Amino acid sequence: MPYGIEDIITELSELIRETLVDGQRKRSPSYWKEDPGHLEAMHRHLVRYDRGELVDKDSGAHPLAHVGTRALMQAWLESHGR
């Protein structure tokens, strides 16, 4: 069976979901539209990954999943003039 875009989106969205659940547990649901710190958070998670961390201590998600989620949030903000 061919592996399509929807399959990829489904699998990757689970990684994103793990990071979002953690974020909403700590912050308001719309925090990501107000948070000016996406780039700083991306950097922080990249540094942790570079130091060998493969599981975020708070969320249990992979640090690069946090980087990806924050990158998408920042891209959305910039794409919507915020």
Feature map (PLM): residue ranges:
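Intrinsically disordered, low-complexity regulatory regions
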Residues: 1-82
